[in-house]
Amino acid sequence: LGRFSFCCEIAFSGEVWMIAAMKRMLLVLTTILTILSVLAEKTLDIYWVDVEGGAATLMVTPAGQSILIDTGNPGTRDAGRIHEVATQQAGLKKIDFLITTHFHGDHFGGAAPLSQLMPIGKVYDNGIPVRNPDRNRKDPAFILKVKPYKTMKVDGRVVVKPGATLPLEQTGGAAKVGLTFIAGARKFIDAPKGAKKNPHAGTVPSMKEDLSDNANSVASLVTLGGFRFLDCGDLTWNMEAKLVEPVNRVGTVDVYQVNHHGLATSNNPLLIKSVAPTVSVMNNGHTKGCTPSAFAALQDTKSIRAMYQVHRNLRTDGEKNNTANEYIANLTKPQECKAFTMKLSVTSDGKSYTVFNPRNKHRRTFKTRKH
């Protein structure tokens, strides 16, 4: 009996030891997973919210700060979509910085409704116009349209000056993040010292002067370490040329948000070939944007390895002017559209980035180029 008791004690002790060892192992695994989770969160995330041919590009820095460039159309639809992506996908409670590229309804219209759904910090724009910034200067309707934007509750307002930067927080374990304004109100950042003449200069003729507010668009260069992302709003042909001619003020980039939804009055081949992106992302609509000339300019740029679209072009020219379905977030007609959001994540060191299409779970990773 004593020997049996002794054996039972040994067995029991061994069982206790194994349970304790398993608990220690689980604790170690939990700690490792927590550390990996924290590291995984230190990405720069970019979301292209589907606002049906408008613009709304949401970014979350490694420090967790949020930057929203444009807010889509007036009404509750686009503001609701931005709010859903911000809160449910990005885990945000506030928009820290809102940048309005220009005063067309598909770019500033959703701001006031969004401010009713979540707090907005500082707003950056060219200054609210006192009259219609397009050709019809005496249009009284514009003053009524811009009033909600003018009176919405925000933490502060700043007029953009090319060369200025956003006061972004930095965080340990991640490369330096930054956003520099490179254009606004037809003014541009200074060219780098010692910059040589752009070899592409003079290769593309100019267009008739654009008198709309598109030409005033704020352009932003976003960086994380060596990674570079260019968002120029609806900047048009002649202004695009001034960014890179006679010298390239921008340099090369990794990702180019296709200007003006892919419309023909923008996407000057001179600009696209000069900034030489690896990836393009077009925030077009079902029938808006993705025009033959803009699509051709992207196709003819040798550096581009992948062309993404928020929508498939459903016009009759769509057979020729569309990227592969794999790279398109939304394929269907408006009444069937599920408003999938294209997402890009840059690693904390800025050395690579991954584009994710939630519609088909497509995922592709690219190495950041040397600039």
What is each of the regions a protein language model found here?
Residues 7-8:
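Cysteine-centered motifs
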Residues 26-37:
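Bacterial N-terminal signal peptides
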Residues 41-94, 213-237:
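Conserved beta-strand hairpin/beta-sheet module of binuclear metal-dependent hydrolase folds
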Residues 41-44, 108-236, 303-370:
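Flexible, acidic/histidine-containing loops and adjacent segments that form or flank the divalent-metal
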Residues 44, 62-68, 72-125, 131, ...:
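Active-site metal-binding motif and surrounding structural segment of the metallo-beta-lactamase
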Residues 50, 59, 70, 102, ...:
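Divalent metal-coordination and catalytic microenvironments
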Residues 55, 75-76, 103-109, 129-133, ...:
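Active-site environment of divalent metal-dependent phosphoester hydrolases
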Residues 124, 129, 244-334:
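Long, structured stretches of catalytic cores involved in phosphate-ester chemistry, encompassing
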